[in-house]
């Protein structure tokens, strides 16, 4: 371990890994610290949907940022594979966002003018996915809302960053960050280092660092419970989505089903009630799923914020300190754009001011400092 880095990134989930990669691309002397294994917690628990249209209901700066990040994924797989040899396992079948009522139809058809979104009648949906529920009224087909396997995206980011010169430290928690003259002091069990810039990207566990650095931004854990089943019986090529529940087909033959939303629950173990509610919604979309064999089940902690948007940007009083945390349900989707934005800020490049304003650390909608 060196004594000094140009940039230290705290948190080895998909957000921190993406930041380390984009900084390494800029030839920044970068270190990435993770208390456990890279991508081992919230990132591995995610289904990996790149659902800009599914998750973002308002056409604001957040939606624009999500669409930008979704577009970045189009060339990302090849770029990372060339450096890391890791396949991010992108599945390009698209998504059916299902309607089960006239109210659903009216809401979904507000997206008709968007690129890559098409309305399908009930008959057209069932022609494409014959095992979807016969109770649907139709669906919006979203061609660009594809999915990846998050653990492998994170792994690819980490290996690619390392190939470009970043130093990676697993099982090395950052204990403390403080301002020390012209440099920033970072304390770890393996030794102390200094950095010109520090980026906090520790998901729901970022609150400790906000507090150490004089900020009161709160993070709320929102537990999500998922399961996977083996699908040996029916064809399913597209993600099915309704009422914040999804069924995602994997190339392995598994279907990933999720997810609950339990605010304030720090437990990373699913409970029977949560799994039951997920399966109830899944059977509504795909009745045949009730006969499939269970593969496994798990839970993860989404990093929630007061207004549901992430913190991405500089410390309001110290431009050397940056934050990228609080991505809630959208960490996988937003990772490329977040990594590039943080890198651009550190490199003093021109950035989109609407995004900076929407995600600024001191926005009144989210926190009082």
Curated annotation (Swiss-Prot):
Cofactor (UniProt): FAD
Any one Gene Ontology cellular component term annotated for this protein: cytoplasm
Residues reported in the UniProt entry to bind FAD: 14-15, 34-35, 42-43, 47-49, 174, 327-333
Keyword Cytoplasm: yes
Notes on how activity is controlled: Is competitively inhibited by glycolate.
Temperature dependence: Optimum temperature is 45 degrees Celsius.
UniProt-listed GO biological process terms: amino acid metabolic process; response to herbicide; thiamine biosynthetic process; thiamine diphosphate biosynthetic process
Class of enzymatic activity (EC top level): oxidoreductase
Cofactor binding: number and manner: Binds 1 FAD per subunit.
Predominant subcellular localization, coarse grouping: cytoplasm
Binding site for substrate: 302, 329
Subcellular location as annotated: Cytoplasm
Inactivation phenotype: Cells lacking this gene have an absolute requirement for the thiazole alcohol for growth.
PANTHER family, per database record: GLYCINE OXIDASE, SARCOSINE DEHYDROGENASE-RELATED
Record's subunit section: Homotetramer.
Function description: Catalyzes the FAD-dependent oxidative deamination of various amines and D-amino acids to yield the corresponding alpha-keto acids, ammonia/amine, and hydrogen peroxide. Oxidizes sarcosine (N-methylglycine), N-ethylglycine and glycine. Can also oxidize the herbicide glyphosate (N-phosphonomethylglycine). Displays lower activities on D-alanine, D-valine, D-proline and D-methionine. Does not act on L-amino acids and other D-amino acids.
Designated name of the protein: Glycine oxidase
Organism of provenance: Bacillus subtilis (strain 168)
Gene coding for it: thiO
């Amino acid at each position: 371990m060196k004594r000094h880095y140009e940039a230290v990134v705290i948190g080895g989930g998909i957000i921190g890994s993406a930041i380390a990669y984009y900084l390494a691309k800029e030839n920044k002397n970068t270190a990435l610290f993770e208390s456990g294994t890279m991508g081992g917690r919230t990132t591995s628990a995610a289904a990996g949907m790149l659902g800009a249209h599914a998750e973002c209901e308002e056409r604001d700066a957040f939606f624009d940022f999500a669409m930008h990040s979704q577009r970045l994924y189009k060339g990302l797989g090849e770029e990372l594979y060339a450096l890391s040899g890791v396949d991010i396992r992108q599945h390009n079948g698209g998504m059916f966002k299902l309607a089960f009522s006239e109210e659903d139809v009216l809401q979904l058809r507000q997206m008709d003018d968007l690129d890559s979104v098409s309305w399908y009648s009930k008959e057209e949906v069932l022609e494409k996915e014959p095992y979807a529920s016969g109770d649907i009224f139709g669906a919006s087909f979203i061609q660009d809302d594809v999915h990846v396997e998050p653990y492998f995206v994170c792994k690819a980011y980490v290996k690619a960053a390392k190939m470009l010169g970043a130093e990676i430290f697993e099982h090395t928690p950052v204990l403390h960050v403080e301002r020390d003259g012209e440099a920033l002091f970072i304390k770890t069990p393996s030794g102390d280092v200094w950095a010109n810039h520090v980026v906090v990207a520790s998901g729901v566990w970022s609150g400790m660092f906000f507090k150490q650095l004089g900020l009161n931004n709160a993070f709320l854990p929102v537990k999500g419970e998922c399961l996977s089943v083996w699908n040996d019986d029916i064809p399913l090529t597209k993600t099915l989505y309704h009422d914040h529940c999804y069924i995602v087909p994997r190339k392995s033959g598994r279907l990933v089903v999720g997810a609950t939303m339990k605010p304030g629950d720090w437990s990373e173990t699913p409970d029977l009630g949560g799994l039951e509610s997920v399966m109830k919604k899944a059977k509504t979309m795909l009745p045949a799923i009730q006969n499939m064999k269970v593969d496994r089940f798990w839970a993860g902690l989404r990093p929630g914020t007061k207004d549901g948007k992430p913190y991405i940007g500089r410390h309001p009083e110290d431009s050397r300190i940056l934050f990228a945390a609080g991505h809630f349900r959208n960490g996988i989707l937003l990772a490329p754009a977040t990594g590039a934005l943080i890198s651009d800020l550190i490199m003093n490049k021109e950035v989109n001011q609407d995004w900076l304003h929407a995600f600024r650390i001191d926005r009144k909608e989210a926190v009082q400092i």
